[in-house]
A protein has these predicted regions:
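Surface-exposed acidic/polar loop and edge beta-strand patches at domain peripheries
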Residues: 1-125, 136-139, 148-223
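Hydrophobic beta-strand positions in extracellular immunoglobulin-like domains
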Residues: 129-130
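Structured soluble/peripheral alpha/beta segments that form catalytic or ligand/cofactor-binding pockets
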Residues: 142-143
Length: 223
């Protein structure tokens, strides 16, 4: 499904996890370079890893270790949606969806993702609401996973302090680090290098990951 305004468009897969396949605004493609010419039928996101954004989780998240049994980035990424519909509300176009996960003797929840496109704007909203329908607590591990295009010399900014960003020190099993990548990570940990500007692409493959926790202690609305 392609939804558009005067500034650009989104291509969305309403029936597969409400994945956003592509995003283009003001003549700029926002999606990372990848090998996929089009979406592929998939049950795991790695089988169609060319999208701009997807909902990662919900019962489990991230890269499974040897001891884990969950799919890469969880069951929601490629979930077969039960319902999808469009709503027009003033200057907004909203794509809604519903997915009910139920497993005998297991978890039961309702996921309701939403994408909102605004009139004459390059900003759009990605939302997710989750309701536990079981009689017991459920684990919830959610991430809105964005795959942005690499922009040379782009800069990062945020309204949280730099010192709360923590570098991931573990190396997942699917990552094959190079010697220069390991050395660059060590320089970051020692305070000798930073990633405020994307000016050294040779050091960013594999990806470099930072964590931040308890953001509400610093701002009501992290940006």
């Amino acid at each position: 499904l392609k939804i558009a305004n005067s500034r650009g468009h989104l291509i969305i897969l309403p029936w597969m996890g409400q994945m956003i396949w592509d995003a283009q605004f003001d003549g700029h493609g926002l999606t990372m370079c990848n090998m996929f010419r089009q979406p592929k039928p998939a049950t795991e996101v790695i089988e169609t890893y060319g999208c701009f954004a997807f909902h990662s989780g919900l019962l489990a998240n991230g890269c499974p270790s040897a001891e884990d049994t969950h799919l890469l980035h969880g069951e929601m990424a490629c979930a077969a949606m039960d319902e999808a519909w469009l709503e027009l509300d003033g200057d907004m176009l909203r794509l809604n969806g519903r997915y009910e996960y139920v497993m005998g003797f297991g978890h039961h929840y309702l996921a309701q993702p939403t994408v909102v496109l605004h009139k004459s704007s390059t900003l759009f909203d990605i939302k997710m609401a989750v309701t536990n329908l079981a009689s017991v607590d459920m684990p919830l591990q959610y991430m809105c996973h964005m795959n942005y295009a690499y922009i040379p010399n782009a800069t990062f900014s945020q309204n949280i302090p730099d010192e709360i960003l923590r570098l991931r020190e573990s190396v997942p099993s699917h990552v094959n680090p190079t010697a220069q990548w390991l050395a660059f990570n060590q320089r970051i940990m020692q305070g000798e290098a930073s990633l405020s500007t994307l000016s050294q692409p040779e050091f960013y493959d594999p990806e470099i990951v930072f964590f931040a926790d308890k953001l509400d202690a610093y701002t009501d609305q992290p940006e």
